């Protein structure tokens, strides 16, 4: 449900656009669907394009015409993985788009205790507001910095640094470790930052780093067995 005005309901739909990168054909398709059904287009803060003002009877038809997946599958899930231009920017320190797309594929629609946002950026300038997200992955010359618990909602919170100077693989598995720990230990409805505050950052960081070391050791053993 998008809007109720004078007793009439209109709806909005938001197709999946990984990292905010979209092909010209898909962008034209979204515009054509909005035009066909009299909708308005809105560039969202989550790096997607929403079609707003649709009539109830047109929602399903609009999705069929788009032929795209929805941007959000559940209210309590990983909402999106935002990315900066990175490889198209002179300031980028790593190929963070490659890592970001890998994270997006892994966590698209993944269920969480509360809505969760992840951002992957190519340098410390953090053009996609990484430090206002639940999990932030920031590239530097020496590797990736991982922070957790950021928020820009009703209770703004800066994230806590968890690890730094990780390789691409290590950064991916660190995000996975944070996600798993959050899902296993947090209360339903609890934002990641609130969870960290409840158990303390010292415990959160210690537990996550221990789990991460175990995960990496297991991965090394599996790789050795497959050689």
Label each region the model flagged:
Residues 122, 131-191, 205:
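Mobile "lid/hinge" segments at catalytic clefts and subdomain interfaces of large enzymes
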Residues 109-111, 145-158, 216-219, 223-224:
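Short, conserved aromatic-histidine micro-motifs
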Residues 13-141:
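Small-residue-enriched alpha-helical segments and adjacent helix-cap loops
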Residues 120-125, 194-202:
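A glycine-rich phosphate-binding loop feature that marks nucleotide/adenosyl-phosphate handling sites
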Residues 1-3, 201-227:
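N-terminal charge/polar-biased segments
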Residues 39-45, 112-116, 184-198, 217-225:
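Flexible, glycine/charged-enriched surface loops at secondary-structure junctions
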Residues 1-11, 22:
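Intrinsically disordered, low-complexity polar/charged tails and linkers
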């Amino acid at each position: 449900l998008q809007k109720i005005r004078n007793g009439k309901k209109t709806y909005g739909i938001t197709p999946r656009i990984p990292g905010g990168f979209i092909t010209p054909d898909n962008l034209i398709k979204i515009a054509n669907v909005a035009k066909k059904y009299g909708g308005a287009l809105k560039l969202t803060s989550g790096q997607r394009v929403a079609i707003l003002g649709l009539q109830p009877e047109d929602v399903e038809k609009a999705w069929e015409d788009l032929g795209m997946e929805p941007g959000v599958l559940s209210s309590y899930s990983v909402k999106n993985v935002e990315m900066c231009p990175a490889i198209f920017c002179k300031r980028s320190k790593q190929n963070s788009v490659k890592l970001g797309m890998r994270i997006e594929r892994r966590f698209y629609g993944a269920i969480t205790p509360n809505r969760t946002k992840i951002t992957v950026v190519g340098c410390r300038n953090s053009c996609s507001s990484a430090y206002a997200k639940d999990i932030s992955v920031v590239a530097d010359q020496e590797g990736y910095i991982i922070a957790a618990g950021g928020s820009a909602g009703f209770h703004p919170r800066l994230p806590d640094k968890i690890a730094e100077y990780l390789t691409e693989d290590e950064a991916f598995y660190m995000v996975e470790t944070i996600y798993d720990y959050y899902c296993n230990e947090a209360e339903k409805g609890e934002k990641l930052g609130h969870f960290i505050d409840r158990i303390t950052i010292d415990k959160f960081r210690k537990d996550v780093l221990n789990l991460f070391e175990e995960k990496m050791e297991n991965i090394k053993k599996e790789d050795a067995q497959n050689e």
